[in-house]
Amino acid sequence: MADSSERAAFREVLPKQGLLFTEQTPIPVLCKPKIMPMKSVTLEKLETMQREAQEAVKRQEEEQKLQGGMI
């Protein structure tokens, strides 16, 4: 008997007119991982500048050797 009286006390009431609100909890959304470059853009620029400078020095040394050998 106690169960039937408790059920009657907690009767569900749904409105026939008006707004019905529901509570939603945020769910984490998994995104695709972002691929990071192995080297930064500035590091690549520095490496290319260094390579170009080394090549320029080698060219100058070769030109000096050729001119020194001719004289």
UniProtKB/Swiss-Prot annotation:
Function, in words: Required for primary cilia assembly.
Domain of life: Eukaryota
Statement: the UniProt record of this protein carries the keyword Cytoplasm: yes
UniProt entry keywords in alphabetical sequence: Cell projection, Cilium, Cytoplasm
One GO-annotated biological process of the protein: cilium assembly
Signal peptide start-end: none
GO cellular component term, pick one: cytoplasm
One Pfam assignment: BBIP10
Family: Belongs to the BBIP10 family.
Protein's cellular compartments: Cell projection, Cilium; Cytoplasm
The protein's name: BBSome-interacting protein 1
InterPro entries: BBIP10
